[in-house]
Amino acid sequence: MKIHEYQAKELLRKYGVVTPRGFHTVSVDGAVKAAEELGGKIWVVKAQIHAGGRGKGGGVKLARSLDEVRQHASDILGMQLVTHQTGPEGQKVRNLLIEEGADIQKEYYVAALTDRATQKVAIMASSEGGMDIEEVAHSTPEKILKEFVDPLVGLTDAQAENLARGIGVPEASVAKAVDALKRLYTCYMETDASLAEINPLILEGNGNIKALDAKFNFDSNALYRHPEIVDFRDFDEEDADEIEASKFDLAYISLDGNIGCLVNGAGLAMATMDTIKLFGAEPANFLDVGGGATTEKVTEAFKIMLKNPKVKGILVNIFGGIMKCDTIATGVVAAAKEVNLSVPLVVRMKGTNEDLGKKILAESGLPIIAADTMAEAATKIVAAVK
């Protein structure tokens, strides 16, 4: 689960990380009122969407007067903000963060994330703050430093100091940078985050260290322990079909292709998508019905896939272990009839009650294309949609 920048900073402040003063608003008048309350001579008007690259897309503007605050807020609020992370369709801006200006002397990058290779927490830091960290990793990987933290020990002062000095924090501000890093780590651990990123972490002229921007992702499997974080969820920022799928315990992610995929098991689902690509087409979605699929779940899965106008065909790939093939077959037939399926449908099923499942499909009276292997299934659906 993702949250907005203003919510991420609220979390950081709770853990003692210093951030600029700012106010969240959803209106132009609210933006002006926020600037008046903040005082000063310079403000930042920031679009709040669940994507990076907002500045390059025109979603972050400096204002040197209240009139400019009003103008920028009016321009940004309601705009369809396109960044390298949103895709060409962009995301509508419904929220703003109005912040006081900052005396930026230097920008750094810091983040905490799980490193599966070492089974530890990786604390990353770079002197190249304010940039897309993927670009830094590609062009100058030597500028990214890492410390691997044993969760049973925690981030030590020595590790934090190594990072702070390694990215060039002035000696007079090292202690403050160490404090920020340790607080970020604590926040990451205690909230069950999968990513806690500050980009940039800035050095001000007075030597203070502040989090100028922040991004958090949370492990959805741990949200039951954090109702206060669940309250941050903004459904307007999420894909409507993914929200609908979650109501039926379907793992669904929309993609850009034209072949809908209905599979049981995440690994098989990814292998199915890979096979479709191997045979020259693109999957329209990832959809895992899980091991307890019912006729209702399969029907809803079909409805969700077919909401996408790009879907020109559907591939069902089932391995009957916990999930019995006849159950899936019954669901597929019922779903196809209920939605008046008009696109090609290829079904490949193996495992428990396989023969019964194939019999149900064959006797359904529907133009279902059967396949025995993944390669055959992919070949047939790719040919059918061309």
Curated annotation (Swiss-Prot):
Binding site for Mg(2+): 199, 213
Cofactor note: Binds 1 Mg(2+) ion per subunit.
Reaction catalysis annotation: succinate + ATP + CoA = succinyl-CoA + ADP + phosphate; GTP + succinate + CoA = succinyl-CoA + GDP + phosphate
Pathway it works in: Carbohydrate metabolism; tricarboxylic acid cycle; succinate from succinyl-CoA (ligase route): step 1/1
Gene3D superfamilies on file: ATP-grasp fold, A domain, ATP-grasp fold, B domain, Succinyl-CoA synthetase domains
Cofactor(s) the protein needs: Mg(2+)
Residues that hold substrate according to the record: 264, 321-323
GO CC annotations on file: cytosol; succinate-CoA ligase complex
GO biological process, one term: succinyl-CoA metabolic process
Keyword terms of this UniProt record: ATP-binding, Ligase, Magnesium, Metal-binding, Nucleotide-binding, Tricarboxylic acid cycle
Any Pfam family matching the protein: ATP-grasp_2
GO MF terms, alphabetically ordered: ATP binding; magnesium ion binding; succinate-CoA ligase (ADP-forming) activity; succinate-CoA ligase (GDP-forming) activity
UniProt subunit comment: Heterotetramer of two alpha and two beta subunits.
Family note: Belongs to the succinate/malate CoA ligase beta subunit family.
HAMAP family reported for this sequence: Succ_CoA_beta
Protein name: Succinate--CoA ligase [ADP-forming] subunit beta
Source organism (scientific name): Aromatoleum aromaticum (strain DSM 19018 / LMG 30748 / EbN1) (Azoarcus sp. (strain EbN1))
Gene symbol of the encoding locus: sucC
